[in-house]
Design a protein with these regions (language model features):
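Conserved Switch II/interswitch segment of TRAFAC-class P-loop GTPases
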Residues: 148-149, 162-181
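Beta-strand-loop-alpha "switch" segments that mediate conformational coupling across diverse proteins
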Residues: 97-98, 206-252
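Conserved beta-strand segments of the P-loop GTPase G domain that flank and frequently precede/overlap
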Residues: 7-8, 36, 95, 143-144, ...
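Switch II (G3) loop of P-loop NTPases
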Residues: 117-122, 126-157
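Walker A/P-loop phosphate-binding motif and the immediately C-terminal alpha-helix
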Residues: 2-42, 47
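Conserved C-terminal guanine-recognition region of P-loop GTPase G domains, centered on the G4
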Residues: 179-192
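P-loop/Walker-type NTP enzyme "switch/lid" segment
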Residues: 40-134, 245-247
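Well-ordered beta-strand positions
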Residues: 141, 163-164, 233-235
């Protein structure tokens, strides 16, 4: 059974980097990994994972055509938007698409209600995409990079698609306030969708090493204060300038914190 895992942050922080390193480690262990970029506003996973080719089509094209078509048969298929990663043949990437004037228009249209409308129709392009990925790639795991903030596509990825969710945060009041709302929405969705609530994990990053214990304590206090019970683990990722400067193509010994997370999947 393919496990579906989403990475989310209320403020844009660290999701794409986490996915890239986790995908790399899982692939090195022999797992087949599919990475889907739902971060329509600031897509970057295709750059970080160094795709072999890029033919200018992606998630936005797949959704947009199916939103407007009266038929399920569209010119853009899963074969057109799935690309191999240079780092490993075990990693397949479904990017958002080429960032041109057409992309901006289509992404804006999707953001203005088309995504939500998929759930009012018999045919749902989002679920169709996931099923197509499963059939074509047969991955052990699907990793989804989501938009930050509160939006339809991230909500769908978390509440309707995912078995596990990793929530990236930095322990300050902005994140705490936003995540309190998000966690309540996840809890309510468990009843609305009649499906099992996803397993919630927190990733704290990027943490200055000298302040790690203090910041972890702050998160634990927030969890206790808000009576947050439905979560599994808290992971802490140290700030590492080598990751910032070098990207993903670095020695495994440098990204140990991400390997710990990957090994839990």
């Amino acid at each position: 059974v393919t496990k579906i895992i989403s990475f989310y942050s209320f403020k844009s922080i660290g999701c794409t980097t986490a996915i890239a390193f986790i995908a790399k480690h899982l692939a090195n262990k022999g797992k087949k990994v599919a990475v889907i970029d739902f971060n329509l506003e600031s897509p970057n996973i295709s750059n970080l994972l160094s795709l072999e080719t890029f033919q200018y089509k992606g998630v936005v094209d797949y959704f947009y055509e199916r939103a407007l078509s009266l038929s399920h048969q569209c010119s853009t298929t899963i074969n057109d938007i799935c690309y191999r990663c240079n780092l490993s043949q075990n990693i397949s990437v479904i990017p958002t698409g080429d960032i041109d004037k057409y992309y901006i228009h289509r992404a804006s249209e999707l953001d203005r209600g088309l995504i939500a409308s998929f759930y009012k129709k018999d045919f749902n392009p989002i679920r169709a995409l996931i099923n197509d990925v499963k059939k074509l790639i047969k991955p052990d795991v699907i990793l989804i990079d989501t938009n930050s903030g509160i939006n339809d596509l991230s909500s769908i990825a978390i509440n309707d698609l995912s078995d596990v969710v990793y929530i990236n945060l930095f322990p300050n009041e902005i994140h705490f306030k936003g995540l309190t709302i998000i966690l309540e929405a996840i809890k309510r969705s468990k009843f609305n969708n009649k499906r099992k609530q996803p397993v919630i994990n927190f990733i704290l990053l990027p943490l200055p090493h000298m302040r790690k214990k203090k910041l972890l304590k702050k998160v634990e206090q927030w969890i206790q204060k808000n009576n947050i019970k439905d979560f599994s683990n808290i992971y802490a990722v140290d700030y590492n300038y080598e990751i910032v400067l070098s990207g993903i193509d670095i020695d495994e010994s440098i990204y140990t914190d991400y390997k710990i997370i990957a090994n839990s999947i």
